[in-house]
Every structure is written in C-alpha cells, then in structure tokens.
A protein has these predicted regions:
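Structural motif
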Residues: 63-67, 95-97, 143-145
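Active-site and donor-binding regions of nucleotide-sugar-utilizing enzymes
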Residues: 115-180
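N-terminal amphipathic/basic-hydrophobic helices that include classical n-h-c signal peptides
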Residues: 1-19
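Histidine-anchored nucleotide/phosphate-binding helix
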Residues: 62-63, 67-86
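Active-site-proximal region of nucleotide-activated glycan assembly enzymes
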Residues: 14-29, 170-200
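Short N-terminal or domain-adjacent regulatory/targeting segments
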Residues: 24-59, 69-71
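Short, charged/polar "capping" segments at the starts of alpha-helices
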Residues: 69-71, 98-104, 173
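Conserved nucleotide-cofactor-binding alpha/beta core module
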Residues: 82-86, 90-131
Length: 200
C-alpha cells in the first residue's frame, strides 16, 4: 500500500510539473502574440534571397550565447571567423558583459550587454537599438541554442533579409533560416553550419 501511495505521489508531482511547464509555455506564447499585435515584435519577412549584397561591405551581426557553456563552444567554433574576405566584411558581435574576459575575436566591433535569465527585454535595449539601427545588416545570426525572448525580440526589431537561429517552438516567428540540432543534440554542428553560411 505504501508503494502505491509513493507512486501516486510521484505521478502527481510529475503531473504538477507538466502543468506548470505548460502554463509557462502558454504565457510565453501569449506574450509573443500580444507583442506581435502591438508592434513590439516585428513580423518576419516571408521572402528570402540567399545572396548577400555584392560590391558593398557585408554587414553581419552575431549574437553570442547567453549561457557560459554554449558561449565557450561558440567562441571555439568561430575562432577562425573572418580570416578570409575580412576586408569586405563588417562584423558586429553582441556578447554578455560577464563574458567580456572570455571573448577574444580580434575582428569587428563588440557590444556588451547585461542580461539576467528573468529578463524578457534586454537591459538598455533602446540604446542598443539606436546604435544597431545605424547599420543595414545583410545577415543576423543568433547563436543561442535555446530560445531567448529578449534576444529574439531585439532581432525582430532590426532590418535584415536573412535572420538565422536555432529551431524552437517560436523560431518561425523570428528566423527565416533555422538550424535543427534536436536529433543530434550537438550544438557545435549547428555552429559549423552557420560558419558555412557566413563563408558563402
């Protein structure tokens, strides 16, 4: 009898956790829907041209991951970024402030942001947008393997024909090129695919 009660208790805990996660997901969906309807998130363009602009410097914005393990993998995967055609390209990197000492790419401009996992809007978003909107980006890349609303919202407010991110429940709303690593679970493969896109 005790085992049955323990089993029921465990099942009820799993059920409560499942309901909590469902409510959290539903809340996030409503927030994205509301922000889209009110213009606080811009709708993704449906048309896509896979050729970057010719003859002009290519402007590329790369948002590095907000969690440290993914950030370290991304830094390693992109260590050779810009070694070819560096004169033609202008890179801007967005990096979390607490990773400043870990970031060693020697090309482009770096912008450092403050962020906590509870933030749904980036701290200092207005100033960041003012600075970034001075550029017309050919491609914007979000290297966060897990969905981050604050980053996706920022990207939605910037102009670019190509927006690259990892596939998630919400990625259709924000990215017109999506990388799915759900089967392999190896984010470095996704980073290599992005490197290939940037090398074209």
């Amino acid at each position: 009898m005790k085992k049955i009660i323990e089993g029921l208790t465990f099942e009820s805990r799993v059920c409560k956790l499942s309901m909590f996660m469902s409510l959290k997901l539903l809340k996030l969906r409503w927030k994205i829907f509301f922000w889209t309807m009110t213009g606080r998130i811009k709708k993704m363009q449906s048309r896509l041209q896979l050729t970057l602009s010719h003859g002009n410097p290519e402007n590329i914005l790369i948002v590095f991951p907000l969690d440290e393990p993914s950030f370290r993998v991304a830094c390693y995967a992109f260590r050779d970024l810009g070694k070819n055609n560096v004169q033609k390209r202008k890179f801007i990197f967005i990096v979390r402030e607490q990773f400043r000492e870990l970031f060693h790419l020697r090309i482009g401009d770096s912008m450092f942001i403050k962020h906590s996992d509870k933030d749904i809007i980036l701290s200092g978003e207005k100033l960041l947008l003012q600075s970034l909107k001075q550029n017309k980006f050919d491609i914007i890349v979000d290297l966060n393997p897990k969905f981050k609303l604050a980053i996706s919202r920022l990207i939605s407010l910037l102009k670019s024909e190509m927006k690259v991110g990892f596939a998630s429940d919400f990625s259709d709303q924000f990215y017109n090129i999506q990388l799915d690593i759900s089967k392999s679970g190896i984010m470095e493969k996704g980073f290599k695919q992005i490197n290939w896109i940037l090398a074209q």
